[in-house]
């Protein structure tokens, strides 16, 4: 019927010899360049068409070659191992939900390869065999390098948690657990009774020790208390005595050097001894008195003699 109508049979197009492969595109363009020039009559148009078609043809060739390589890798016997090592690398440090998704992808791919995709044999492509083996080994080493810091961190955290747990619990606060993991009420009561008994025994021992110390050192303690109470507190003089000394100072502020008779009368008035009176006047002169420039030299001489006498 096709021949009667002037058409060629479809069987003529089924032969590989009649099909054009992507690699034949370039030769076809080169062989027809002259015809295109004659057909269109313009060199610029031919150049424009060639520059537009060549990238598309090269892209088609690259895509075709990439598809062929992918199909070869996917049908290789080592592809399941390659996928396994790749997923193991992705699972290092990944959250639990991401790890589950990766495992599901691996199971689905395994089912697809088993039921649908045919596998090639070793030796069919030695270069691809070497590539697959090398890449699998690289991924295994990469996974080991990735997992090392995570394993070290996990070990360190577990060690710290154990130390903290030991510090928080300790042997003194450790309690016995029942079969269901809870502390039984009977054991709690017994522990409370033991603690109360220990406290009572400790208080009784303290009282006994205190009584023994009082019986043995009571007299010494009493004598020490009496001796401490007799000692006068060091520091400021009594208020009345200090006021009497200040009154004498204000009257004799031009020459605040009391005579021996003045000291005796001040001692009788204040109840202080000679040493306390001398010390008070020495400190008072150092802090609050400065000799006048118009003071006679003979008074200065007398003051120096009195000062050294004190």
UniProtKB/Swiss-Prot annotation:
<dbReference type="InterPro" id="IPR008422">
    <property type="entry name" value="KN_HD"/>
</dbReference>
<dbReference type="Pfam" id="PF03790">
    <property type="entry name" value="KNOX1"/>
</dbReference>
<dbReference type="GO" id="GO:0003677">
    <property type="term" value="F:DNA binding"/>
</dbReference>
<dbReference type="Pfam" id="PF03789">
    <property type="entry name" value="ELK"/>
</dbReference>
<dbReference type="InterPro" id="IPR050224">
    <property type="entry name" value="TALE_homeobox"/>
</dbReference>
<keyword id="KW-0238">DNA-binding</keyword>
<comment type="subunit">
    <text>May form heterodimeric complex with the TALE/BELL protein BEL1, BLH1 and BLH2. Interacts with OFP12 and OFP14. Interacts with BZIP30.</text>
</comment>
<feature type="DNA-binding region" description="Homeobox; TALE-type">
    <location>
        <begin position="229"/>
        <end position="292"/>
    </location>
</feature>
<dbReference type="InterPro" id="IPR017970">
    <property type="entry name" value="Homeobox_CS"/>
</dbReference>
<dbReference type="Pfam" id="PF03791">
    <property type="entry name" value="KNOX2"/>
</dbReference>
<dbReference type="GO" id="GO:0000981">
    <property type="term" value="F:DNA-binding transcription factor activity, RNA polymerase II-specific"/>
</dbReference>
<protein>
    <recommendedName>
        <fullName>Homeobox protein knotted-1-like 2</fullName>
    </recommendedName>
</protein>
<comment type="function">
    <text>May play a role in meristem function, and may be involved in maintaining cells in an undifferentiated, meristematic state. Probably binds to the DNA sequence 5'-TGAC-3'.</text>
</comment>
<dbReference type="GO" id="GO:0010094">
    <property type="term" value="P:specification of carpel identity"/>
</dbReference>
<keyword id="KW-0371">Homeobox</keyword>
<dbReference type="GO" id="GO:0003700">
    <property type="term" value="F:DNA-binding transcription factor activity"/>
</dbReference>
<dbReference type="Pfam" id="PF05920">
    <property type="entry name" value="Homeobox_KN"/>
</dbReference>
<feature type="region of interest" description="Disordered">
    <location>
        <begin position="178"/>
        <end position="208"/>
    </location>
</feature>
<keyword id="KW-0539">Nucleus</keyword>
<dbReference type="InterPro" id="IPR005539">
    <property type="entry name" value="ELK_dom"/>
</dbReference>
<dbReference type="InterPro" id="IPR005540">
    <property type="entry name" value="KNOX1"/>
</dbReference>
<comment type="similarity">
    <text>Belongs to the TALE/KNOX homeobox family.</text>
</comment>
<dbReference type="InterPro" id="IPR005541">
    <property type="entry name" value="KNOX2"/>
</dbReference>
<feature type="domain" description="ELK">
    <location>
        <begin position="208"/>
        <end position="228"/>
    </location>
</feature>
<dbReference type="GO" id="GO:0009736">
    <property type="term" value="P:cytokinin-activated signaling pathway"/>
</dbReference>
<dbReference type="GO" id="GO:0005634">
    <property type="term" value="C:nucleus"/>
</dbReference>
<dbReference type="InterPro" id="IPR009057">
    <property type="entry name" value="Homeodomain-like_sf"/>
</dbReference>
<dbReference type="InterPro" id="IPR001356">
    <property type="entry name" value="HD"/>
</dbReference>
<feature type="compositionally biased region" description="Acidic residues">
    <location>
        <begin position="185"/>
        <end position="197"/>
    </location>
</feature>
